Amino acid sequence: LPVAWGAPDNRERLARYKVLERKHEARQPEEEDDAFLRRCAIVATISRVAASDGDADRLVELLQRSNRLNYTKDRPDSTWDVLDVAGAYDSYKDEPGERICWKVIVRDAFGEYGVVGVVAASRTGDDWRPRHFTFSCRCAGMRVDAALAAWLVARLGTSALPAAAEGLLAVDASAVTIVVDD
């Protein structure tokens, strides 16, 4: 059975470690990264953040706590409301232009990792600019960030990708399947 990631109790925490243990044991010592990642069957589902999104608390937590995989280094303060700012991004009234926000949910052959990413951009005129491009360490090494970088550039253009994430475009993320649910 897939294991969901969230606010853990002791059993859930143990289940998380069991997923990682199974994944570690499944890796062959001589197996290259690309081959192992393909065998993992990684799926990243990208969904628009809705004004009534049930994952709002997780999205705020992710933006506040992520360090290494926070490519914009933008952290909202504790009063930031994802439902007002990100959830209703397309119709947010206090700023001109179009805004868009997605959450990223990841699963692979070993389990479900839950919401592991927030990708957001805003547009005034023709150019998009990055607002958030942040991922949890739960997906570190899975190349989900590289797959999302390529997807974002294809969808909105290079101006939507943070400068710190441009190097991801050179990473082979072909082992990650992107599913868009918006």
Locate predicted features:
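C-terminal cap/substrate-recognition subdomain and adjoining C-terminal extension
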Residues: 1-102, 110-115
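Acyl-donor binding region in acyl/amide transferases
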Residues: 108-109, 115-182
